[in-house]
Amino acid sequence: MSWDLGLFGAREAGERNAAASVLDARGRLQAARVALVADVVHRYLDIRMAQRQRALIDEQALLDARALQLAQVRQQQRLGTAEAVHQLQLQAGQSAALRASLRETQARSAHMLAALLGRTRPDAQWLQADAKAPLPGPQALGVAVLPADLLRTRPDIQVAQAAVERAAAEQGIAHAALYPRFVIGGSLLYSFNITQNLRTTQDNAPTFGPQIDIPLFDWGRRRSQADASELALQAAVQAYRQSVLDGVAEVESALAALDAQRERIASLQSTQQVLAERERVQDQRLKLGLDSEFGGLAPRRAALQARSEQTTALAAHALAYVALYKALGGAPLPAEDQDAADSLSLIHI
């Protein structure tokens, strides 16, 4: 065994290197937690959006089928053209293709969510269409400028900070290597001869004394290593600064996306109100005999498309929150002894 005195900053550099390793491990653990929570929420939102969209596309398919039936009757009665029938047939085919695409997206998201939750198969409810599938509504964030401390919770910034600490520790070790190193060591060598029945004083050889490492013949190598460690420290500092700038840019982009999606939802709500009023007027005209059923199908289909766009906007707004969560590194940090599954308790599926 040996005991290094750790002179000339060697002991402090070793402790700093160990602390950097702990910080790096915490950053990578936090990155795994953030990725897990974000992926679970992302797949959950995909499922809910697909459930709503499938319910809307099924209702739209019924309207398309009815419109095609009425168009064929109008063509037979010389009130419509074959081109109108062809357009409605193409429209019905596009709706069927969209329905298949939504079913595929929903199934893929359901299986991925089941895998993230440690299940072998998804719940049957996740694969059904549901017009009332819950989606979070738009909410104002209420924060104009985020504190800089929130960025420190980003895993990549923590890893970059750990790299700076490690580079500084290596630079300290390389600097300490330029000076003599003092180590107090001791050992005990014991042997036993199986041909003898008695123990003798020659069976063990203890040693104890100091060891001195002097940079005499390898001074140039140690000096070059110290210079290289200094440059590595400067590179780590620059990488840390770039990580901070990238984090700020990602957070700003997420906030901009939140504002844009909020404005989009507000615009779609205004459009939906206009279409709802138009549909109400059309129904009134139909009751009074001033219009036909065929003429009222187009406004109803436009209202369904507006609802579909609003569903997409709500999901995009929720995903923007997920992007902001990832951009902030999942701030605040969870307790070290908290299991990763506890982070999923806020998500009700």
What do the PLM-derived regions correspond to, one by one?
Residues 11, 27-146, 257, 261, ...:
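Periplasmic alpha-helical coiled-coil/stalk elements that build and connect Gram-negative outer-membrane
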Residues 1-2, 123-143, 165, 172, ...:
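Small/polar, glycine/serine/threonine/aspartate-rich low-complexity segments that form flexible
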Residues 215-225, 251, 257, 261-272:
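C-terminal substrate/ligand-recognition segments
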Residues 42, 87, 205-207, 253, ...:
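Transmembrane beta-barrel architecture of outer-membrane proteins
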Residues 120-121, 288, 309-346:
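Acidic, low-complexity, intrinsically disordered peripheral segments
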Residues 79-82, 135-165, 215-216, 241-244, ...:
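Bacterial Sec-pathway N-terminal export signals of envelope proteins
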Residues 1-16, 27-34, 38, 148-149, ...:
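A glycine-/polar-enriched beta->alpha junction
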